[in-house]
C-alpha cells in the first residue's frame, strides 16, 4: 500500500503522467512491493516557499506497510531525491520527504484493513 504524496511549486503542466508512472515503478522496486498497490499523488503548482524563496521546492511523504525505516530510508532518500531532481528540476537541498511505516490495521483498503 505504498502511498507517495509530494507537493511542489513546479507548475502542474510541467509534471507529466509519465513522470507519475515512473515514480510508481521506482517506489515499487525500492520497497519490493507490487506496483498494483502503489499510489502516487503529486500536487504541482502549489504556493510554496523554502528557505525564504519561491525557487523550485517541495515536500512529501512515503507511507508504507513495512519497507521503510532506519537505514533503509537513506537508500530510499537517495533514489527519490535523484528522481525528483532529474524529473522536476528541484535541487535536493530544497526538498523534504518523510518516511512513515504504517500498521496494517490503520490502513483501509477495499472495505477492510490490511
From Swiss-Prot:
Signal peptide: none
Gene Ontology CC terms: extracellular space
Name of the protein described by the UniProt record: Macrophage migration inhibitory factor homolog
Keyword list, A-Z: Cytokine, Isomerase, Secreted
Active-site annotation: 2 (proton acceptor)
Subcellular location: Secreted
Reaction equations catalysed: L-dopachrome = 5,6-dihydroxyindole-2-carboxylate; 3-phenylpyruvate = enol-phenylpyruvate
Function according to Swiss-Prot or TrEMBL: Tautomerization of the methyl ester of L-dopachrome. Inhibits migration of human peripheral blood mononuclear cells.
Organism whose genome encodes this protein: Trichuris trichiura
Domain of life assignment: Eukaryota
Pfam family, one: MIF
InterPro entries: Macrophage_inhib_fac (IPR001398), Tautomerase/MIF_sf (IPR014347)
Disulfide bonds: none
Binding, substrate: 33, 98
Family affiliation: Belongs to the MIF family.
